[in-house]
Amino acid sequence: MANLRFEVVAEAFKKKPQEVIPPAERPSEYFGKNVFNRAKMYKYLPRDVYEQLIDVIDNGTPLDRSIADAVAEGMKQWAVERGVTHYTHWFQPLTEGTAEKHDAFIEHDGKGGMIEEFSGKLLVQQEPDASSFPSGGIRNTFEARGYSAWDPTSPVFIIDDTLCIPTIFISYTGEALDYKAPLLRALHAVNVAATEVCRYFYPEVKKVTCNLGWEQEYFLVDEGLYSARPDLMLTGRTLMGHDSAKNQQMDDHYFGTIPDRVQAFMKDLEIQALELSIPCKTRHNEVAPNQFEIAPIFEETNIANDHNMLLMSLMKKVARKHGFRVLLHEKPFAGINGSGKHNNWSLSTDTGVLLHAPGKTANDNLRFVTFVVETLMGVYKHNGLLKASIMSAGNAHRLGANEAPPAIISSFLGKQLSDLLDHIESSDRKDLFNMAGKQGMKLDIPEIPELLIDNTDRNRTSPFAFTGNRFEFRAVGSEANCASAMIALNTAVAEALTDFKRRVDALIAKGQDTTDAILDVLREDIKTCKPIRFDGNGYSEEWVEEAKRRGLDCETSCPVIFDRYLDEASVEMFESLGIMNRKELEARNEVKWDTYTKRIQIEARVMGDITMNHIVPVATHYQSRLAKNVMDMRQIFTPEKADKLCARNMKLIEEIAERTQKIETGVEELVNARKVANRIESEREKAIAYHDTVAPKMEDIRYQIDKLELIVADELWTLPKYRELLFIR
């Protein structure tokens, strides 16, 4: 084992980039190759069936089961021509990942042979065993039945030899056991509420779509080095490891030249993603060494979220092909930036209007201000819930660490927009600033054209920032299912818009002019939600104190933060809009607490294992070597001379003894803390115990281990060090 580290390091240096050959010269030629998109629907479905299915997708018309057989037959024909042999209902249980069970297309033909068969019944509904998925107590282990139901709004796709059908997943009694079902309900709610408000400005609007553009950050580590780190393999992050002398302090990795092996991985990933209609647009080095980002063009939120879940699965598969392992954990390495997944969120109408973009007319700008302010109202009223929607054991390491947004939800608007809202709040005038277009900036360099400057700057410390025509929710973790944040955000905004319309209509009913009524309600809301607006430094201690004075949620304990889901305001909002009922919310919190506990529990067990089987033996071995050196020196020199010459070694022997003793004591205390926590029946209280008593002991043990790493001879250290994990590419 002592030599494994050096073997994998040597092997990593020998690896060369793999050749990646695109299936065609232009990406547009293979985009959507493995997706049953509209073009393929048109080709493989009868015309009347095609038109009915498009009506379902575009207008939310209920699916007529009578067309299911024809749709299934068309899908099967296309899939079989592509060499597909199996199908699966692909869904997103409360595990943060995806789930699937593969069934073959074959059935008996009644003559002793087999035929390929796929019916509408199999397409529309399946019965996966729900007993082994997280349910938060909604289902008992012996109550196995659950239903997966086809989501026609998200295209069917092919992975290898399997036809994957995006579905929702519900219990036998109808409660949602997944992320997609409540997401679809939240998107419907914001569509209804936003459309109603839109008609004050554009009576012709029939539908509002929620758009999402995610930015997926990740680390790549050589597979050999990964295999020599049990903590990475089992927890997704390093539980120990001293900082590399060089990490990200030179700012030379961000937007730097992409390493050749990584470039080959990215190219391969993009090809496979494009074949699945994932519109990858951007790739680049991130701030930390061996950290990267991939981002697509924005899409409708449900499809964008499916694509993100699909891409994360694809990344793991392609990384292994190229001799890497992809790390999606929010904080795989201490001392350098963690990974997030910025969610760029916006609303747009079926007539092509971006609702969070300023316009050229007073009507456009009044609409713009309305949707900005009501978004802020939703975020302000439910800022604790939004924090709960993005919180996890992994993301808790990243938030508030002077590298990511703080664990206090606030919104950055920029000076121009903030001044506009202040102007509206304090003025009785109906005229609005013209926010259209961009200002020009001349650089006085003849070869460089005039730059167009956005009307807002960027504030990287803001968790929820306005960026010109959308809001960027930056607190979402890299490993998360975006649906969690999107459910909370869209529901909160839907509630705010619904309440806004109710109050405006009440004023209109009293005879007030529509514009006057809108401005009166906006003035009231601008004043109400002002505490959520913050354009300063979110990392400062002053902001924490200021946020408390403003009444914002400043809780930092992950298990306690989850309580916000069960606040009366949250329950009332989710129930009134038909997103989730109290029972479903309680169940999801049980799952969140249980997941948090198990994450920390696994980390604690792995730390104990590595500590006692790697760290302590290596440290004591080096200590014995030092002791032998001292003994040998005393054989050669006088006692006085030997003591003088061996003073440093004696000091190291003593330090190793003290640190290993603290480590061994720490591991014993860690085990005992786990035992005490495990006896707690309440999932909430157990999670709090793991947060308060188990996690801190792991940090204490890590501190001692990281000090030993600097003492023990490098040749004896068995675990790949940060300099190797982060700089071998």
Predicted region positions:
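N-terminal hydrophobic targeting/anchoring segments and the immediately downstream early-domain regions
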Residues: 2-24, 141-157, 162
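Flexible inter-domain linker/hinge segments
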Residues: 7-8, 20-38, 42, 188, ...
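Active-site core of metal-dependent hydrolases
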Residues: 30-143
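Active-site proximal loops enriched in glycine and acidic residues that flank catalytic Cys/His/Asp
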Residues: 67, 91, 119, 296-298, ...
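Active-site-proximal loop/turn and secondary-structure-junction residues that shape catalytic pockets
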Residues: 67-71, 91-93, 121-122, 169, ...
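Short linear, low-complexity motifs centered on an aromatic residue
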Residues: 96-113, 131, 229, 236-238, ...
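Glycine-rich, acidic/polar active-site loops that bind/position phosphate-bearing ligands
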Residues: 143-328, 337-340, 347-590
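C-terminal amphipathic alpha-helical interaction region
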Residues: 524-729
